[in-house]
Amino acid sequence: MRKSGKRNLVLALSAAMTMGTVMTAYAGPGAQPGSSVSTSSGVITAGQGQTQTESGGPGAAGSGSFTQNEPGQTQQETSPSQPINQPSETVPVAGALENGVLLEKTIGNNNQITNLSMKLNGVDGAISYGVYVNNGGYLPWKGNGVAAGGTESTTYIEAIQVAITGEAAKHYNVYYRGTSAYAGQHGWACNEELMGTVDRGDYLVSLEVVLMPKEAGAPGTYERRFFSNHSEYIRIAEGNTTYTNADGTGYTGWVDHDRARYYFQNGKAVTGWNYIDGMKFFFNENGALIMDVDAHIGKQDSYQIRVNKELNCLTVFAKDGDNGYIVPVKAMLTSVGDDTPLGTFQTPEKHRWRFMVNETYTQYATRIIAGQGFLFHSITYETANPETLITSGYNNLGVTRSLGCIRLTCANAKWIYDNCKIGTEVVIYNDASSPGPFFKPHQVWIPEDQTWDPTDPAFAGR
């Protein structure tokens, strides 16, 4: 996967812009200065800025203060009091696919990227992206030209993840890097890896994305791909991950770093099974929390399902003997509705296929409340045929849009259908402060013309 290889297919995205600008890179003429930029999903307006058209290659490189650690250690980086890196001229890339992507960004103060969208152009498939912003953390993933980020000038993007699906994903890996105002240019991230900074007061000022053939390697170094406010203190190593406070003492508590979660006791990460905060967790050899322990514990006699309506996700819990349901098993992304009820219920029945009130069908339906129409179920279909998926429902998992049911991917709906007996307790609650003991899952978008759920086991290997 990371070898030198053939011609690379490039989606070159750069934010070499001035304050208050929406930038578009695509095949075709740009909008006139001062106008809005239309996409298939709506309009992004730049206020007093202007729309520019760009095609080409990578954005600027930066020169932050950087210390290379010994092998096995985490890279360290220090930031000056003022931003030192700004976007520069786009540099063409040999072998690039000209105008391979439609890119739109809104640029705020100090060249901050406040929101962005991407769309594949001339390549079959879909591209999706999730961003971490200063005033909202990790936002729901978007894709296929839908804007991700903030709508106000006080929002800026600190980090990003990118993924491709469909035919594009069969032949290419997606690599991406950017420049942060303080940290400088980051190394290349690949296929959903996190790139940028988190909680350091830094922000992206440029971005580039490259599609590389599966047999080819990365277009450059991976060094300095990501920094968090823990980067200077955490050292990740098998069986010996440590976290040292600034004063040299060992840290005790939870740490989230690079989309992984750790728990430290006196500076050393715990491994294996541990009771923490009233729950029982499993950690791997590096100390990273395992956020799906289904394969480790096997099918249980009973489960409890806790649905966070506010944040559109749920966590399945298993029983730990007399301690009750304190073992988080897995998290699932949901799409609830305004009418989804709060409270504690017991599931009364299941349906392999179910005809819905809006004349659609759904798979693996588990009723939540006896005598009422609220169900756990897959995304809806036009007919009782798994190749008639309503794609918009799949791509909007994580968004409140059902009539009150709790929508899931086919795989997750099937897991509940197969594993949770009639009478399973379901707790539906609101908590905007935390999705639960695990991270909120994200959903990579699928192409708009794909009418089957990629998680459906009926299409395994397709």
Model-predicted segments: where are they?
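Ser/Thr/Gly/Pro-rich low-complexity, disordered linker/stalk segments of secreted
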Residues: 29-88, 452, 459-462
